[in-house]
Amino acid sequence: MIADTPALTPAPYSGYAVEGHGLVKSFGAFRAVDGIDIAVPVGSIYGVLGPNGAGKTTLLRTLLGIVDPDEGHRTLLGDARPLRMARQVGYLPEERGLYPSMKAFEAIAFMGALRGLPLAEGRRRAKAMLEGHGLGGAIDKPIRQLSKGMAQTVQLFGTLVHDPRLIVLDEPFSGLDAINQEKLEALIRDRARAGVTILFSTHVIAHAERLCERIAIVAGGRIRFEGTPAQARDRLRSQVRLRTRASDGAWRRALPVDTLAQDGSWHFALPDGGIEPLLRELIEGHAGIESLSIERPGLHDAFVAIAGADAARAMDAAGNEEAAA
């Protein structure tokens, strides 16, 4: 847990920490954000999912006021001019960058000072953060001597040191090994429990499935789905895998018409009436049930159905490249 960070009092704005309506942003002939509506509830963990090039980074930068939309409007912590709220926001950009000669604790304090935190207090908090996360040995090390993952952790701490009400993270898990990814997930949950709103982008679906209360699936600059992960999964029917000793008989008429048969097993969507009526007919028809499993769809399955197989393959490829790096 980050030291000296009390739970936040209720914010003086509406129920949404971030809102965007009808947002459009083009670069020449390329429309990176194409008519997006988004609302991030206060205190929530909200994930923007999509492959590289989907428009995630441009959307975050537009919401933060780093770039202005060509059309539409946005509010950040209740203010229609987002940059005025910069001191209450922690932002980790996709492009990482720290001064290589600066010591780790100084880099964190410096980023806090840019957000209005007194330098002496920033140094105190920086040392406490590093020590509290088992990185006390890195306090006085220059950035150039740190591993890539440790340097990224330092930049993340610089995003958090001034106790922002809103944290925006662009691909925060990129470049981290599995252990540091788990630590980052724990840190995100910790901040959310303190009342901080977390908005992050990712092309790794598993992180969103574990962390997010709400998600937006983005492809081609548009939001293809917005809601809870459960709502995304509920768009798909559960799948049944059945194996029988008998290969034929009157009982087969009870199987759904779209059943796929393969080597004595049957694969079909869970019937609307549930599995019990079908089981009765199979038992009475002496099908000889050897095994039966019901597979609930995951968020990856929902992503494929919503954004398309090409977008899912691009997401998977990017994740595999990171794992191999």
Kindly give the residue locations of the regions a language model identified.
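ABC-family P-loop ATPase nucleotide-binding domain
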Residues: 1-24, 309-325
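Short loop/turn segments at beta->alpha junctions
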Residues: 103, 118, 228, 271-274, ...
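Short, charged/small-residue-rich alpha-helical element at the C-terminal edge
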Residues: 238-310
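A generic structural signal for short beta-strands and their flanking turns/coil linkers
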Residues: 87, 236-238
